[in-house]
Regions:
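Short, basic-rich loop-to-helix N-cap that marks the start of a DNA-contacting helix
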Residues: 58-71
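Recognition helix of helix-turn-helix/homeodomain-like DNA-binding domains
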Residues: 45-61, 83
């Protein structure tokens, strides 16, 4: 959510903004983990290109995939989408 100036409420992100935030956050988490995309895919039980497809916007994670990523990186679902 984005805080609007002076209004005291948050504005919902567009789907494009949310997708971009997800990709940016996922990239950050992958880099911070010190693991390769392939290693993460193997540990999650996905094919070797799964993370790359998510990062490039060529695939959308399923609800199960979102839960797996959040658990793997030890973050909340909202944090995975760039919210604090």
């Amino acid at each position: 959510m984005v805080e609007t100036k002076g209004k005291g409420y948050a504005k919902a992100l567009t789907s494009e903004e949310r997708d971009k935030k997800f990709r940016e956050t996922l990239w950050y988490l992958v880099v911070q983990s010190g693991r390769s995309e392939r290693q993460i895919c193997q540990q999650l039980g996905h094919n070797s290109g799964y993370i790359n497809k998510l990062l490039n916007g060529n695939a959308d994670p399923s609800y199960k995939g979102i839960l797996e990523l959040a658990e793997y990186f030890n973050v909340g679902i909202r944090e995975l989408f760039g919210e604090k």
